[in-house]
Amino acid sequence: MSIKSDKWIRRMAQEHGMIEPFVERQIRGEGDERVISYGVSSYGYDVRCADEFKVFTNINSAIVDPKNFDEKSFVDVKSDVCIIPPNSFALARTVEFFRIPRDVLTICLGKSTYARCGIIVNVTPLEPEWEGHVTLEFSNTTTLPAKIYANEGVAQMLFLQSDEACEVSYKDRAGKYQGQRGVTLPRA
């Protein structure tokens, strides 16, 4: 497996719709305003967070059960920023829609700007032939409220291409998150 470069990412996005919408260079500011960077980097793609959030609350739940998750455990927020309570978390989604090639595995790493503030981004790998908006999980590990910015960079996708295509892809096995749009809650 080898990591793919900006040139490969650009070609796959433009010719095969791997990332939509696609920003072909790294954006660090818009006019006089600084933003947390997004777009193509040397060996990855920095994704943006959309303005749809689900902020965790423990008002209605006593137990968090991934096999029987209660949607009332979240408060929906639509805003340019999301405030995550101390020691809590929020779900969001990427602005970008991904179509992963059959011979590629994509790994997501949180941006250091957030990590250095105690905000951790978690995403499981994007498997071969998976497609959809990526659901992002933000953990606020601090004892203070934490702010997430919509439409700015939050994580970096790294594309690893295998020397051969897999026998069975995510699409082949009809994975439960295939084609997801918007913020997607746990499915057991």
Swiss-Prot record:
The active site is at residue 137. The keyword Nucleotide-binding applies. It catalyses: dCTP + H2O + H(+) = dUTP + NH4(+). Pathway: Pyrimidine metabolism; dUMP biosynthesis; dUMP from dCTP (dUTP route): step 1/2. It holds the Pfam family DCD. Keywords: Hydrolase, Nucleotide metabolism, Nucleotide-binding. InterPro entries: dCTP_deaminase, dUTPase-like_sf, dUTPase_trimeric. Catalyzes the deamination of dCTP to dUTP. Homotrimer. Belongs to the dCTP deaminase family. This is dCTP deaminase. It comes from Pseudomonas fluorescens (strain SBW25).
